[in-house]
Design a protein with these regions (language model features):
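Short helices/loops that flank or line small-molecule/ion binding pockets
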Residues: 102, 108-127, 142-146, 171-172, ...
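Extended ligand-binding regions for polar small-molecule ligands
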Residues: 41-54, 86-95, 163-164, 171, ...
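Bacterial N-terminal signal peptides that target proteins for export
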Residues: 17-26
Length: 299
């Protein structure tokens, strides 16, 4: 009996000792976590006080972009891959020893791009706005923003199938009297009309590609990114872009990012990074991985 009681007492002591050790361990862990949190808070407070945007981003280790969540293949919030603009931005940020974050700014809602600017980059929820086409002049942007250097150009590409599958140029299509699907009241529509090239008018690129998938036309001139979108929507379609086709310079438009005008050091960093990524061929590689042809910026 005495032996049993002694054994029970020993077990109680062991339990109490174990509970005490656990309590000490949890207390120590809490103190470490609290100290780490305080240090991180102090670091964030210190970095928040840095006025220069690029220096502040480097202090935090994060540079944030604004992008449209529903603009694939440029960018998308839910899905992989994330879009070529996102991947290009990630490469830019990597060159600066930072990581990329994205604040999603829907440009397709009421108020459009202007509202997206107000709710994002003007509100300093991000520092770089992605996915902008331009005419080369800053007056296309609000006064508070400025363009970066162009990182690529996009334009109309020639897509063929069926009886036009082996034709390579607009002249060959004209000689064979093959109608070309084109979006009405666009520069390409005007070009085909002016040069007496047979055409079939559609309401937008998506409708053109749907028409090709249905066999309504065997050739089309569409925006470069439209083919990548159509390949997802119509995976069994037989159309393809003509290899080596290069849009005329006056039918191509540069793509750029934008930053706030006061962020001069950030602008210089992004411009230098774009030059480096163009020289290395990285931007071309990213674009072509999305099924979008790469064309260098036009001057």
């Amino acid at each position: 009996m005495t032996s049993d009681r002694s054994s029970i007492d020993e077990r109680h002591e062991e339990c109490e000792e174990l509970m005490l050790k656990k309590a000490v361990w949890f207390l120590s862990l809490s103190l470490v976590l609290s100290a780490s949190a305080l240090r991180a808070q102090d670091q964030n407070q210190d970095s928040d006080e840095i006025k220069d945007t690029l220096a502040r981003a480097k202090a935090k280790g994060v540079l944030t972009a604004c992008a449209d969540p529903y603009s694939w293949p440029y960018s998308q919030q839910n899905g992989t891959p994330p879009g070529f603009d996102i991947e290009i931005f990630q490469q830019i940020v990597k060159l600066g020893g930072m990581r990329a974050e994205v604040y999603w700014a829907d440009t397709g809602t009421r108020g459009g791009l202007g509202r997206a600017f107000r709710n994002s980059i003007f509100a300093k929820r991000c520092d770089v706005f992605l996915g902008l086409s331009d005419n080369g002049e800053d007056d296309a942007l609000p006064d508070k923003l400025t363009y970066t250097r162009p990182y690529l150009s996009l334009g109309y590409v020639l897509v063929v199938q069926g009886k036009a599958a082996n034709l390579k140029t607009l002249d060959e299509l004209k000689q064979n009297n093959i109608k070309i699907g084109v979006s009405m009241t666009t520069p390409m529509d005007d070009y085909l009309f002016t040069n007496n090239i047979p055409r079939e008018l559609y309401l937008g690129n998506r409708r053109i590609m749907e028409g090709m998938a249905k066999g309504e036309v065997d050739a089309s001139m569409v925006w470069a990114t439209a083919v990548a979108v159509a390949k997802q929507e119509f995976p069994d379609a037989k159309f393809h872009m003509v290899d080596g086709y290069v849009p005329r310079p006056d039918q191509r438009f540069n793509s750029r990012f934008a930053v706030r005008k006061e962020d001069k050091s950030l602008l210089d960093f992004v411009n230098q990074s774009i030059d480096q990524l163009l020289s290395s061929g990285k931007i071309k590689q990213i674009l072509e991985s999305y099924g979008v042809p790469f064309y260098p910026p036009v001057s």
